[in-house]
Each structure stands twice: as C-alpha cells, then as structure tokens.
Amino acid sequence: MREQRWKRLRTGLLIIAFSAIGMLEYVQLVQAFDLPQMMLVVPVVSVIAMLLLGKYSFFVPVCTIVLASAYQILAGSENAIAELRTSARSIAIILFECLLVLMIAQFIGLGLGAAARILGKKNKKRVVKIVIGVVFAVVSLVPYLLLFHNPLYPMTARHRLKSFADKTITDYPIADKKVYYSLNDSRYMCRVIMSDGQVRVLYLDENGEAKRQ
C-alpha cells in the first residue's frame, strides 16, 4: 500500500512538473514569440516524460492546456500578442496557434519517447535503456538543430542583445529591455525602452552580432 501511494504521488508530481514546464514555454511564446526556445525545450522534456511516466505522460498535454488557459485568463492583456494593433479575434487566433504549436512539439516528443520505451523493453540492461532514451532525446532536437544550429542560441541571443544595450546606449537611462523572437525576420530582437518613453530596437545579424536597427 505504501509503495502504491508513493508511486501515485510520484506520478502526480511528475505530471504537474512536466505540465508546468509546458505552461512556462507557452508563456514565453505569448510574451516573446520565443519559438527557438520552445523547439529546444518541449520535445526533450516530452521524451523524458514518456520515459518516466509511460501511458500517464498523455496527461501532460491535457494539464498543460489547463494551465495555459488559466494563465491566459489571469494575464489578460499582459503579453506581447495583446500589444499588437489588431482585433480581438486575430489575437485569439494567434493565441490558439501558439498553443497548437506547443501541443505538436509535445506530441512529437511523446511519440519519440514511446518509440524509445518500445525499444528499451527488448533490452533488459538498464544502461542500454538509458542510452536509447538519450539517443531519442537527441533525435527530438533535430528540427531545432537544422533551423538554428546552436543549442545555446536562445540564451546567447538574449545575453548579447542585453549586454549590447547596456554598453552602447548611455545617453538616457534604460527603463526596460524586452527580448523577443521576430517571426517575420527569423531572428532575436530587443526593444529597449528608455526612461523618456522612447523605444530603440536592436537585432542580431546573420553572424550573431548585435546591432542597432
């Protein structure tokens, strides 16, 4: 009985943890359109969820939808999408598209995790199962690597843009820096909001160097 309770508790906590990660990536999508980070994190986490939870991992997308919906209700207009000058219907469509992209990434990871579990069952050695899991986790990153190449791209892009803003913009105090991924330009950009209300835009060029727009 005690072992069963512990197993249920562990399963529930893992579902909540993986769902929370999915919700955080959704938040990053609607706040900064951060597609690269989502493609980097969500598939790998979903592979791990399937390996640890098995069939119960399919509760993760469901809980993610619930958490994302709750966030959207509480956040209201406090996201990048709501700042767009467009109709409420268009905003709703974009929010749905963000959630749909997240779900696709989750199910790709879950599918790869399921394949890893099937192959792992044919091998009783734990080391072999771990290796298979790692291989499929790496495979889940193939679309991201084909598009963005650098595994640390989201982190390095944010760091370079913020550092460049601090070093080069000195004529006015900086009130805020918002880094986002431009879907139209396919690169990270930064809106630097000055204390006088002016906004200056920075971006990363093809070589990964920060520049002013």
Describe each model-derived feature in a short phrase.
Residues Y144-K178:
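Short, non-transmembrane alpha-helical segments in secretory-pathway proteins
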Residues E25, L40-T64:
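Canonical alpha-helical transmembrane segments
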